[in-house]
């Protein structure tokens, strides 16, 4: 499949037409706007309420080589971009060689020994072959290599004949805010539902009815629903995709055992946190794979299986798309507009035809290797970028961060 407009054009037009309330276009360093969905002032990273394009638009001078990306124009998360999976102010875990930050009580940069303000574990973590040592960093080339291996390992993905997609009307990025249904037919003409009898698909589907989409309403799991989370993790860990991912992360000194890895996946993906007031109303899994509604708009919802099932029930109305990826087989990528039972999604990117474990693996890989950053991968010889965000308002374990969101932002450099 091919992009209906050049991706660079889509980027520029998307940024130019991004609504004042949803983008930092022409808003960088403005004062706090209480009426805006997201913020672009200098303190928004501290408060976790930046617009998604804040880092690309407002920190360009600090990151001059940051690639232009196909950006979603909606508020996805209150988690600000972060350089580390950890929020442990008294530790160097995940912080080795970071830039000096006057707000930290101790430091992990190269000059902290000179000034005598290193964290106590600086020497053990940053001076040797520790978890965060610079020589232990995962390179772009390594990410591209392992993502190709994961791509080849996805034997549970849909075959060409398993899905008939009717993408119909392709619009320009300037039209995404119009909320006009330009596609009279459903997106999915046919899906071979035998796919859903496979263990990982079946376990994945069992999770989707465990959530209520409105933020502000607390999530409370039954014993059965908690068991379904364990079943899903157990089933995907049997696949070549997840074995490839774990083997890579183990080799990179991220995890010492599969048990540690699975435990961390459960926390980062299924751990609950609050996107609204005090209620624990959200998780990375719910946001990314099931979808949520906040302030009258769809957020998250980046999964084709969820989309198909909701469309089949008449709850999703496909409106249009602005991007169709270059892959001529599955998985592919589609960036689309749709209405979810009364609520609009302005730009939602999703893999199409991938197995649950494939998406889970790539998003996890990028969150672990490039938390809060753009993650450059390669699939079938085509470049692909994934953006993740960390949840910064609460943590688990020793200051580790939850997943706020993860989604495809580009399939070109």
From Swiss-Prot:
CDD domains reported for this sequence: XendoU
Domain SMB per the UniProt entry, residue ranges: 20-63, 88-130
Signal sequence, renumbered to the chain: 1-18
Positions of disulphide bridges: 24-28, 24-40, 28-58, 38-40, 38-51, 44-50, 51-58, 92-96, 92-108, 96-126, 106-108, 106-119, 112-118, 119-126
Any GO CC annotation of this UniProt entry: extracellular region
Keywords on record: Disulfide bond, Endonuclease, Hydrolase, Lyase, Manganese, Metal-binding, Nuclease, Repeat, RNA-binding, Secreted, Signal
Primary location class: secreted
Compartments, record wording: Secreted
Alphabetized GO MF terms: lyase activity; metal ion binding; polysaccharide binding; RNA binding; RNA endonuclease activity; scavenger receptor activity
Transmembrane parts of this sequence: none
EC assignment: 3.1.-.-, 4.6.1.-
Biological process per Gene Ontology, one example term: immune response
Pfam families: Somatomedin_B, XendoU
Reaction(s) catalysed (UniProt annotation): ribonucleotidyl-uridine-RNA = a 5'-end dephospho-uridine-RNA + a 3'-end 2',3'-cyclophospho-ribonucleotide-RNA
Listed cofactors: Mn(2+)
Domain EndoU: 139-412
Catalytic residue list: 287, 302, 345
Quaternary structure (record): Monomer.
Similarity annotation: Belongs to the ENDOU family.
Function text: Endoribonuclease that cleaves single-stranded RNAs at 5' of uridylates and releases a product with a 2',3'-cyclic phosphate at the 3'-end. The UU and GU sites are more efficiently cleaved than CU and AU sites. Targets mRNAs to regulate their expression.
Protein name: Uridylate-specific endoribonuclease
Organism: Bos taurus
């Amino acid at each position: 499949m091919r992009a209906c407009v050049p991706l660079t054009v889509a980027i520029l037009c998307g940024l130019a037409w991004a609504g004042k309330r949803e983008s930092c276009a022409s808003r960088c360093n403005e004062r706090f706007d209480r009426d805006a969905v997201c913020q672009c002032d200098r303190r928004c990273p501290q408060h976790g309420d930046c617009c998604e394009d804040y880092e690309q638009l407002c920190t360009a001078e600090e990151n001059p080589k940051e690639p232009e990306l196909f950006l979603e124009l909606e508020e996805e998360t209150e988690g600000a971009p972060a350089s580390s999976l950890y929020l442990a102010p008294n530790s160097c875990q995940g912080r080795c060689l970071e830039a000096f930050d006057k707000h930290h009580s101790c430091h992990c940069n190269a000059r902290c020994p000179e000034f005598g303000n290193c964290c106590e574990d600086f020497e053990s973590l940053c001076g040797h072959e520790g978890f965060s040592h610079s020589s232990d960093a995962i390179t772009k080339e390594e990410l591209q290599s392992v993502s190709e291996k994961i791509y080849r390992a996805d034997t549970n993905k849909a075959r060409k004949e398993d899905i008939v997609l009717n993408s119909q009307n392709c619009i320009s990025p300037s039209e995404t805010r119009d909320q006009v249904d330009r596609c009279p037919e459903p997106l999915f003409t046919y899906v071979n539902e035998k796919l859903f009898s496979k263990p990982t698909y079946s376990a994945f589907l069992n999770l989707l009815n465990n959530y209520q989409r409105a933020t502000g309403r607390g999530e409370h799991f039954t014993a059965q629903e908690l068991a379904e989370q364990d079943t899903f993790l157990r089933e995907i860990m049997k696949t070549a995709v997840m074995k490839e991912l774990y083997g890579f992360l183990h080799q990179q000194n991220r995890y010492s055992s599969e048990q540690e890895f699975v435990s961390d996946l459960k926390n980062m993906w299924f751990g609950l946190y609050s996107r609204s007031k005090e209620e624990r109303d959200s998780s990375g899994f719910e946001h990314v794979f099931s979808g949520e509604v906040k302030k009258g708009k769809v957020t998250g919802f980046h999964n084709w299986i969820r989309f198909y099932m909701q469309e089949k029930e008449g709850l999703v109305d496909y409106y249009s798309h602005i991007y169709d990826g270059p892959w001529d087989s599955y998985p592919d990528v589609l960036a689309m507009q749709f209405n979810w039972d009364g609520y609009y999604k302005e730009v939602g990117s999703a893999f199409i035809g991938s197995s649950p474990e494939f998406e889970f693996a790539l998003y996890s890989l990028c969150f672990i290797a490039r938390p809060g950053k753009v993650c450059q991968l390669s699939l079938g010889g085509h470049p692909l970028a994934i953006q993740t965000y960390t949840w910064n308002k609460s943590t688990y374990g020793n200051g580790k961060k939850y997943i706020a969101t993860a989604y495809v932002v580009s399939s070109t450099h």
